[in-house]
Design a protein with these regions (language model features):
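Rossmann-fold NAD(P)-binding glycine/threonine-rich loop
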Residues: 167-175
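A glycine-rich, Thr/Ser-enriched phosphate-binding loop motif common to dinucleotide/cofactor-binding enzymes
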Residues: 15-21, 37-60, 73-81
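Glycine-centered, small-residue-biased loops immediately flanking beta-strands
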Residues: 159-160
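Glycine-rich phosphate/adenylate-binding loop and adjacent beta-alpha elements
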Residues: 1-33
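Short helix-loop-beta connector
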Residues: 38-40, 63-69, 133-134
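Adenosine-nucleotide cofactor-binding segment
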Residues: 69-72, 87-150
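Short strand-turn motif at the edge of the Rossmann-like AdoMet-binding core
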Residues: 143, 165-167
């Protein structure tokens, strides 16, 4: 894609397309996520929205590779699916959360490291420490707002940030 962003690049099913729950419709091919080659239609139909969002972000768009490091924010649906998909793909996972109870749950689901953003408001620095100042290959950014600065801070040069949500707001001053 060349030139400035265009609104049409951000119109996908469920985002800005009317009729996404229709039985039949004509849409652009890039609005769909391909079914993995070895999956049946029945298996693909079991993917919930959060799982499909995580899959598209880290596998289709992010091209996650084994042994890469990914940061997932929080313990919501998209982040939990991203954590589990990344672990199944052989990646290292760092998660952020706000409590020790949630941290333990994230670890039980496979997180290699968990950073409490209440204890580390500039959690990107803690992620850098955990990665020997290399940063992460991928960030699943669901918070938006000021969190985006920390995502940029901890992303490896040339890393991939999937902006999925704006739970903390849609504006941020990039530092």
């Amino acid at each position: 894609i060349e030139g400035p962003p265009k609104y049409e690049y951000f119109s996908f099913i469920g985002d800005n397309e009317d009729g996404y729950a229709s039985e039949y419709m004509t849409i652009k091919a890039n609005a769909l996520t391909p079914i993995p080659k070895d999956w049946s239609l029945q298996e693909a139909a079991t993917l919930p929205c959060a799982g499909l969002t995580a899959w598209r972000a880290i596998m289709e768009e992010g091209n996650l590779q084994p042994n890469e490091t990914i940061l997932v924010q929080g313990s919501g649906g998209v982040s939990i699916f991203a954590l589990q998909l990344a672990k199944a793909h052989g990646a290292n996972v760092i998660a952020t959360t706000s409590s020790e109870v949630k941290a333990e749950k994230l670890k039980s689901l496979g997180a290699d490291e968990v950073v409490n953003y209440k204890e580390h408001p500039q959690w990107g620095k803690e992620v850098l420490r955990l990665t020997a100042n290399e940063g992460v290959d991928h960030v699943v950014e669901v918070a938006g707002g000021e969190s985006f600065n920390e995502s940029i801070r901890c992303a490896k040069l040339g890393g991939h940030i999937s902006i999925i949500g704006i739970l903390d707001g849609n504006t941020s001053e990039i530092l």
